[in-house]
Structure formats: structure tokens, C-alpha cells
Amino acid sequence: MGDTIVTWTATDSSGNITLFFQTISIVDTVAPEIIPPENIIQEAENQLLNFVDLGNPETSDIVDVLSISNDAPESFPLGETIVTWTATDTSGNSAADTQLVTVQICGNSPSYYNFIMGTALDDFLTGTSLPDLIFGYGGDDIIMGNSGNDCIFGGEGNDIVFGNSGDDNITGDQGNDVIKGNSGEDTLNGGIGLDMIDGGDDIDTCIVIEEQNSDLVVKCETTE
């Protein structure tokens, strides 16, 4: 890479010499190759902040790759996010490719649900006959699911959450929560705080994180 000076010399029969200098420049104009990490489908950890391990791309270049960057956010929202990876070599050539990150919630795309949003205040939220995605956010909320297969997050505050009918997935999140699945095959997660979890009818799964083993859990056929 770079410039090389070649000296040409011409000599006649009388011994006269003429020199000519030729500059040969080797320039890298070939972009590097980049293969992004595989697309990712990840279950949401939170309604707002979801941290995703993107992995690492594969890169190659005829010289050296100077830098690898991406435009991923610090945390991912629900749904699909396209992450663009860019490799740049020491000559300034670059190549880019994309990775698709999908954050689903309760095993489904957010578009599967009817959205119901709470506020930072104390809310009373009622679901519909459709599959509802209900976020209580802040405050001490009362949340009532309905007949759909609902996905409910209590959020911050001391919440009371009823799944009612349907196969519901309920997370108390933070605070000291009361969670009742009622009918249907429900998955109930108290989250952080001292929680009372009642699976109700049918076959239910209750999740108690290790740090919260003082939660009161009843009528749960499976405990994780």
C-alpha cells in the first residue's frame, strides 16, 4: 500500500545517462466484508427497558478493518428494531449490513394485542374481550383482565391484578402486589416485592424469583 518510486535509467553507447522516475501508487478501493450477527427474537423483560446481547459480526478485508460500529439503542422497545452494522477499513472504505431484533411480549408480537396504558397515578384499568396488553406503569393500580388471553404488567406501585378468564400472563413487576389468575391456564410472576399470588382455577404456573422467596403462593400447579 502507498507509493513506490521506480527509477528508469537509459544509457547510450557513449555512456550518457538519462534518469526517469515513475511513481506507482497502490490504493485500496475495495470495501471490507461484514456479516451481521443472526437476527434475534427475545422476550421482553420490561415494558420500557429491554437489554439485548447483539453478538458480534464477522468481518474481513484485504488490508485491515479499522472499526466496527452499530446504531443499536441502549435498550430496545417492544416490536422490531433494525440494527445497522458498519465496518470501515484503514483506507476509509466501508460496508454495512443489518440485523433484525424483535422484542416480543408474552410470546407474541405487540401487534397481537389491544393496548391499554395506565399512568403514573393510581389507575383502574379494565380489559376487553380481545387479547389485551395492559401496562399499569406507576401508582397503586387495580387491573382487571377480561376474556382474552391477556398480557398484564402491573408496573411500579402496589397493584391488584385479576386475570379473569383466558390464558393470561401476569407480571406484578415492582411493589407489593396481589395477583389472581382466576380461570384459564395462567402464568403469574410476582416480580420484585412481597406478593400474594393466587393461580385460581385450571393449571397455572407461578414464578417466584429467588430473592423473593417470601411471596405467598397458592393454587399453583407449577412453581418456578
For each predicted feature, which ranges?
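Glycine-centered beta-turn/loop sites at beta-strand termini
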Residues: 109-110, 117-118, 126-127, 135-138, ...
